[in-house]
């Protein structure tokens, strides 16, 4: 009889302990999940609605710490609107749609391709962290111009400058006989939507 009583007393304790362990595990999972999720008040609701998808593909490419920067890029590219929110249809990793502006008709695919391409830009620019501002400037401008811009930089100044961004655009306009080629102020245009103002302040200090 005494043994049964002890068993009855143990069961509620075991249930409470199991519930506490579950809550602890769930809280830890949520903490890990939200580690890089911080609401950016400078981007639109449409951009924020893609946060989980962006974080998913950022993690796949090991660039989750750049989530805020990716959101700023989407804000500049499309404001989070349309079917190609990362404007990545002309990117080399787009293998499902035509390589022409706004050809992608699947927002998730646009995000997948765009983030993969930006990861490549970061890698080629040898960016090691968010503190590597010159590398980030180079990676951002290359997302807009294409990797060809990095090859041009390697042959000229060896690093991003606002002037070589202008020069590359002018060169491409002549080479391709077009009136517009990319956005020479793309770095600034992205960073104005990035909450850490250090990068945009440094860009303005160096290149305004």
Region locations from a protein language model:
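Non-catalytic cell-wall polysaccharide-engagement segments
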Residues: 2-48, 53, 61, 98-112, ...
């Amino acid at each position: 009889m005494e043994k049964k009583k002890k068993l009855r007393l143990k069961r509620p304790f075991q249930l409470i302990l199991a519930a506490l362990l579950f809550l602890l595990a769930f809280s830890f999972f949520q903490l890990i999940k939200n580690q890089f999720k911080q609401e950016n008040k400078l981007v639109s609701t449409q951009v924020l609605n893609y946060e989980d998808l962006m974080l998913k593909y950022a993690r796949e490419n090991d660039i989750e710490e750049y989530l805020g920067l990716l959101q700023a890029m989407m804000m500049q590219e499309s404001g989070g609107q349309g079917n190609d929110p990362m404007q990545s249809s002309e990117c080399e990793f787009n293998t499902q749609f035509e390589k022409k502006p706004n050809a992608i008709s699947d927002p998730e695919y646009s995000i997948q391709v765009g983030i993969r391409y930006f990861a490549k830009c970061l890698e080629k620019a040898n960016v090691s962290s968010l503190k590597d501002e010159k590398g980030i400037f180079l990676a951002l401008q290359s997302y807009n111009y294409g990797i060809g811009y990095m090859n041009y930089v390697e042959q000229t100044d060896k690093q991003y400058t606002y002037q070589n961004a202008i020069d590359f655009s002018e060169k491409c306009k002549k080479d391709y006989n077009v009136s517009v080629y990319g956005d020479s102020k793309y770095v600034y245009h992205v960073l104005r939507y990035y909450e850490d103002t250090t990068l945009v302040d440094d860009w303005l200090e160096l290149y305004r």
